[in-house]
Each structure stands twice: as structure tokens, then as C-alpha cells.
Amino acid sequence: MTQTLSSQDPQAPAAPPMPGAAGSAPADVAHPKGIKSYVRRAGRTTTGQAKALEELGPRYVLDYAPALLDATAAFGRSAPLVLEIGFGMGEATAHIARVRPQDNFLCCEVHEPGVGALLKRIGEQDIHNIRILQHDAVEVLEHMLAPGALDGVHIFFPDPWHKKRHNKRRLIQPPLVAQLAARLKPGGYIHCATDWQPYAEQMLEVLSAEPLLSNTAEGYAPQPDYRPLTKFENRGMRLGHGVWDLVFTRR
């Protein structure tokens, strides 16, 4: 994903760290205050993506503001609200929104080609239950979402930060998980997925340690029916790579 720009986006090579971005954060800065939910990536916005940004952005992209979001007004209806942090190029996001039309999906991603790609899918597939915030999800969580506002959270394939000295930059850390849990309604869920086993192990440890959350499985969960296998994921599986899903619910 993704915002933490995920391994769902293999077309976006890493750019040198930018001032203030996650890549330049000191290793000892506490998460999440010193670490954003994303890494800036290089990538060119295509003509089709730019057209979608221009034509559909005004309807589906929300402005960030440090004030609580009125989700009913933003979506034009009252429905269960799911937050997605980092959606890469939007392949899985669009699929899930189509198979779950009863839910609203608030999706955070800072990568402009990814935002344009999802908007293009929205137009082509006639999807109406997605709204996008092109902003750091940590700030969205802190300032725009009230406790108990969410029915679900999706974090699929966040940047694994493979090197041990970079592990503190990973998105799934206790302070962020505590914030997510507090913003879930009782019975709401957090669904994470990763294709990097050491990160899966960290996710399991951190999520299991949060007192407001309960694991729906003994360890890793079966892949829920709504989450599709993306082209990137299918390619990885053909190469023998594993994928780990974790689903925890709010007590």
C-alpha cells in the first residue's frame, strides 16, 4: 500500500527521502508523531489518471481539514464507514467497494498517480461509495475521525521497511494501533495483510497486545472473501511468496 506506499504498487520506484517524509525521520522518533503513514515515491501521472483527477477529483477527493468529518454529508448517505490506509493503484480498493456496496470507504493515499488510478477505476466501474483523502492518514485519524466513528480499517501491504534499522518506521506500531482501536465501534475490525513474514509477525504481536482488540483467529486469519488477489500478489505467489492476513475486532 501505499500511503505507506505498498508493495501493491511495483511501478513506483523509491525516490530519495524528502525533508519531513518518513524516509528522513530519525530512528529514535516515537511513532506515530515523528513518522508519517507514507513514503514519497517517484512516479509519473498518466494522461488517463490526470483526466480522472480533473474530472472526478472534485466529487470524490475530499479536502483535508483539522476538524471532524461529517461522513454522511461527504458520502451523501449514512452507512458503515471503513478507513483504508494506503491503496497503491486502487485495484483491491475498487473491487472491495463494488462487492460491498452497503459500506462507505474513506481511502487515504498521497501518491498522485495512485489517486488518479483509483479515480479512473471509479469512473470506469461506476463506483459511488469511495471518497479519497490525499493526505497523511495519521493526521486524518488524529483530527478528522472521532472515537467510535469507524466500522472497519484496511491496511493492505504497507511498506515493510526490510532493514532492521528501519523497522521503527513501519506503520503498524502500538501507538497507531491504539488510535485505530479507539476509533472503531465495538464489533468493528482491523484487517491487515502483508507479504513479508517478519512484518506479519510484528503485526500479530502488536495487534495482540492491544487490549481493545481480539483476534478472530488463533494466529493469522484466512483471507476474507472480499479481499481480491491483485496482479502483483498473484505474481508473488507464483514465485513462492507467502501472504499473511490478520483480522482483529474491537471488544
Curated annotation (Swiss-Prot):
Single GO cellular component term: tRNA methyltransferase complex
Pathway of action: tRNA modification; N(7)-methylguanine-tRNA biosynthesis
Region (Disordered): 1-29
Protein name in UniProt: tRNA (guanine-N(7)-)-methyltransferase
Pfam family, one: Methyltransf_4
Region (Interaction with RNA): 165-170
HAMAP family assigned to the protein according to its UniProt record, in alphabetical order: tRNA_methyltr_TrmB
Residues annotated as the enzyme's active site: 159
EC number(s) from the headed UniProt entry: 2.1.1.33
Reactions accelerated catalytically: guanosine(46) in tRNA + S-adenosyl-L-methionine = N(7)-methylguanosine(46) in tRNA + S-adenosyl-L-homocysteine
Annotated family: Belongs to the class I-like SAM-binding methyltransferase superfamily. TrmB family.
A GO molecular function held by the record: tRNA (guanine(46)-N7)-methyltransferase activity
Keywords: Methyltransferase, S-adenosyl-L-methionine, Transferase, tRNA processing
Top EC class, one word: transferase
Coiled-coil blocks: none
Residues binding substrate: 163, 195, 230-233
Function: Catalyzes the formation of N(7)-methylguanine at position 46 (m7G46) in tRNA.
Binding site for S-adenosyl-L-methionine: 84, 109, 136, 159
PROSITE patterns: SAM_MT_TRMB (PS51625)
